[in-house]
């Protein structure tokens, strides 16, 4: 049985949660803001450190992709959520889905598991819809 590193996951959630935190303890990473970019840069770095291919599309969706040998033509399994926030957001909103997916992929890789298809982790842009419509 595989078990993710809960402490590692929570440390990343707290680290990302500090991005966009103001002096009053309010967390804000509006899409396309400097805080959103800082959060995306951080998650992108973690994806890269995990050995994933990191891609950002034209509207800012961030993807970390694991393509094991021999399955490049298979449709990927997509996991993820978003890391942008509304004003005064909760710490776990959205980022839990992205960071938990990253932790799962890292656990699978370390265990030696080789999936039959690529696995992509998405951090979708403007999920909260505060910058432009439609959202996500």
Where are the regions that the model predicts?
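Short glycine-enriched loops at secondary-structure junctions
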Residues: 9, 68-69, 83, 125-128
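A non-catalytic alpha/beta surface segment that caps or lines the substrate-entry region
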Residues: 22-67
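Active-site nucleophile and cofactor-binding loops and adjacent substrate-binding regions
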Residues: 56-57, 90-96
């Amino acid at each position: 049985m595989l078990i993710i590193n809960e402490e590692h996951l929570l440390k990343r959630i707290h680290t990302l949660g500090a991005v966009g935190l103001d002096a009053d303890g309010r967390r804000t990473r509006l899409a396309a803001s400097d805080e959103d970019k800082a959060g995306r840069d951080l998650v992108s770095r973690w994806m890269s450190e995990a050995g994933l291919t990191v891609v950002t599309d034209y509207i800012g969706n961030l993807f970390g992709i694991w393509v094991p040998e021999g399955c490049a033509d298979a449709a990927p399994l997509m996991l993820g959520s978003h890391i942008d926030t509304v004003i005064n957001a909760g710490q776990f909103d959205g980022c839990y889905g992205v960071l938990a997916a990253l932790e799962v992929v890292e656990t699978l890789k370390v265990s030696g598991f080789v999936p039959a298809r690529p696995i992509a982790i998405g951090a979708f842009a403007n999920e909260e819809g505060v910058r432009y419509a439609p959202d996500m």
